């Protein structure tokens, strides 16, 4: 299964059509025979040939996804002075205003233009006594939460946990896609980091 995506370029009147793979997680989650191997092959193709994919039957409630997007809309609708109270600083995650960062991702093509996007980066917060927090490591928190948006923190944390659980559930597929045992990555995910 795939989704047709039409992209119109500014440099020509041509329309490019690419197929974005859609991976159905349902049979894998149901434990159907051969589902893991089939899905791992589809995942490998998607990652090697396309670079990204959609998933269906992932188990994350659509209501939660909608609520998460709704909360993000609320925070981005705040006045700039309120958003700047959440600003990422040093190792602290948080709000990154537009035109404040230049991303250089290639030694060949050195980008000098500021990124136009505004971003809200949050991480899975660690307890105060976590070694990463004590050492002041990046991506260990704490997150700066808006004070004037009731329910924001709870909804975003609920989204984080649901998506992290999904990532953990599909981790064996990545191992199988690389011709490794399904539990190959398990030792590396005893204290995982994530950022959104």
What are these model-predicted stretches?
Residues 1-196:
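Peripheral, non-catalytic segments flanking oxidoreductase cores
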């Amino acid at each position: 299964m795939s989704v047709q995506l039409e992209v119109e370029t500014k440099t020509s009147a041509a329309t490019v059509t690419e197929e974005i793979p859609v991976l159905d997680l349902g049979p894998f989650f149901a434990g159907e025979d051969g589902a893991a191997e089939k899905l791992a092959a589809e995942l490998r193709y998607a990652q090697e040939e396309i670079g990204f994919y959609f998933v269906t039957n992932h188990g994350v409630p659509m209501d939660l996804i909608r609520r998460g997007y709704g909360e993000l809309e609320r925070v981005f609708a705040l006045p700039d002075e309120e958003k700047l109270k959440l600003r990422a600083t040093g190792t602290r995650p948080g709000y990154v205003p537009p035109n404040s960062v230049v991303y250089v991702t290639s030694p060949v093509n050195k980008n000098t233009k500021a990124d136009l996007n505004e971003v809200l980066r949050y991480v899975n917060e660690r307890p105060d006594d976590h070694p990463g927090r004590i050492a002041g490591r990046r991506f260990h928190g704490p997150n700066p939460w808006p004070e004037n948006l009731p329910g924001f923190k709870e909804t975003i944390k609920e989204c984080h946990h649901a998506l992290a659980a999904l990532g953990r559930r599909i981790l064996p597929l990545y191992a199988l896609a690389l011709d490794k045992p399904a539990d190959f990555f398990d030792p590396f995910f005893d204290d995982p980091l994530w950022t959104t």
